[in-house]
Amino acid sequence: HWHIEPSSKCSLKCPRCPRQEHPDISWMQKEISLTEFKRVFTKDMLDQAQRFTMCGDVGDPIYAKDYIDIIDYIKSHNPEIQIFTITNGSYKTEKWWKKFAAVSNKHDTINFSVDGYDQKSNDLYRINSHWDSIMHGMKICANESDMFVNWATIVFKFNETHLLQIKGLAKEQGCDDLQLTYSTKFGSKYGDAYGGEYDLLEPSAKFVSKSHRYERHTINLSGRRPMRLQYMKTNFKKFNEIKKQFTGDVVPMCLIGNRGLYMNAEGTIFPCSWTSFPYKSLEHNGKVINWEDSFFVKNKHLVNAKGNRSIEEILNDDIWQTLFDS
């Protein structure tokens, strides 16, 4: 399982995206070209791949100029490799969506991240989104391909009383699932970051995750199920093998491929996407470490697949194991 950020570009300004939360950090405006992707993911590499999750930490995959060509390259090698696209869906033309639908098949899934029920409400969080182009693209994916179409909504204060309306819209658009996310990024969880009790986005307590990780609740609309059998079998096998190494109840999900090895739009490889977010500073073993002085930043050139090193060289290098252990 690979998690790829085809593009670090985005047209939206979602307030709780790292782009907006850390305006002092200069975010990359990068993308992966077809030539770069083919150099990194050779046919031998694709022989080992079962799934690609296409989702940026700070960008949207559909804004990579070669995104459709990249999917076509993967599918031409093995049409059963699963492509999971996560997008806000804004600003693409009918022609683009028809091409996207043509290279996709029943093994693929697309998540449209839509929190509203019209342009005005969607813009309350997905600031600068474009409702009509989202709905048009969603309809084409549902009607002109066999891919699994998922409408994904984060529950906020402004939409919690409109969930039935959103469900109706999702069904009308031909979506297979409605996915409701109960987030943690609210004032009651992180008061200093989100204004405590004055957080205007926070919904009723029942729609806030009970843990420190988001919760997802899925409502099936079509009777179809996404085709993930082989990928899930592989994860389950890895889980049972790795579980023996841990005495506690928690098995790191990155070790079984649940998140996937992550390559961002710059070409840098990470153990998983959670480890790719820059931080100002943190304390580790009683020592304060600034991001720019961290082990990873100092050795980033050694784990970059856009350079002269292959993925095999990176993953077999001692520096990778040191990074993973750190």
Predicted segment positions?
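Non-transmembrane alpha-helical segments in soluble domains
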Residues: 41, 71, 75, 167, ...
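Short, hydrophobic secondary-structure boundary micro-motifs
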Residues: 26, 53, 151, 323-324
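Short cysteine clusters
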Residues: 10, 14-17, 254, 272, ...
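Radical SAM enzyme [4Fe-4S]-AdoMet core and its adjacent flexible, acidic
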Residues: 5, 20-32, 47, 68, ...
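Conserved alpha-helical substructure of the radical SAM core
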Residues: 1-109, 124, 132
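Cysteine/selenocysteine-centered motifs that mediate thiol-based redox chemistry or coordinate metal-sulfur cofactors
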Residues: 301-326
